[in-house]
Regions:
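Helix-coil boundary and interhelical linker segments in multi-pass alpha-helical membrane proteins
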Residues: 1-7, 37-48, 82-102, 166, ...
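Hydrophobic transmembrane alpha-helices
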Residues: 1-69, 73
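Alpha-helical transmembrane anchor segments
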Residues: 188-200
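Membrane-water interface at transmembrane helix exits
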Residues: 16-20, 42, 58, 83, ...
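Structural motif marking the loop-to-transmembrane transition
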Residues: 3-8, 25, 29, 45, ...
Length: 200
């Protein structure tokens, strides 16, 4: 992958992280995030297939009360990077789907860290508001939103730092029973996600 493609992938990851809280342009949705990553890396078709499958899973995820849903943005971005770096094309989609689920759950840890840091930003906004500083309030708002973007951009950059040959070797070294199991499990998770939406 070229340096320009890597930079563009990190930008997509940053936008996906910000959109996780802004919800304006939907960059955090798996279908959009994976498609954009596929577009900038030249792997459009496999990434659209991956994004569509992950979207079916994420449709059933929702924040309810204090319970936070798994991180769809991190799952989409990280699994798309693994798919592209693995170089397996459409054949690697099922493995990428299976990898996305634990990544989504792991993303909750990063979400909690960033939301805790955002509390500091809120206190700074309050202090700026007490002084009548509109620019101060605006600056702290931007910082808080950028923290959400960094939450996805840093793991994306870390994955891109791993040589594609190492990712491909790791994926190719998996035994057939494991890849077949991941393929079946990935398909079941998509079906369960869609079934949850139908039941709503």
């Amino acid at each position: 992958m070229s340096v320009i493609s890597m930079v563009l992938v990190v930008i997509v990851a940053f936008l996906a992280g910000m959109e996780g809280v802004l919800d304006e342009f939907q960059f955090h949705q798996p279908l959009v995030a994976c498609t954009l990553i596929g577009l900038v890396t030249g792997q459009l078709v496999p990434c659209i297939i991956l994004g569509g499958s992950l979207q079916m899973i994420a449709l059933g995820w929702a924040n309810i009360g204090a319970a936070v849903a798994p991180d769809a943005a991190l799952a989409a971005v990280a699994s798309a990077i693994i798919l592209v770096q693995g170089g397996q094309g459409r054949a690697g989609v099922d493995t990428a789907i299976a990898v996305a689920i634990p990544l989504a759950v792991a993303g909750l840890f990063l979400t909690m860290i960033v939301r805790t840091l955002s509390v500091i930003c809120v206190h700074q906004m309050d202090a700026a508001a007490a002084k009548g500083s509109f620019k101060g309030v605006e600056a702290w708002h931007i910082i808080a939103v950028c923290l959400q973007g960094i939450r996805i951009a840093i793991p994306a950059a870390a994955l891109l730092a791993i040589p594609s040959s190492a990712v491909a070797a790791a994926l190719n070294s998996m035994p057939a029973w494991l890849t077949d199991g991941m393929s079946i499990g990935g398909g079941m998770v998509v079906a369960v996600g869609y079934a949850m939406v139908i039941n709503m």
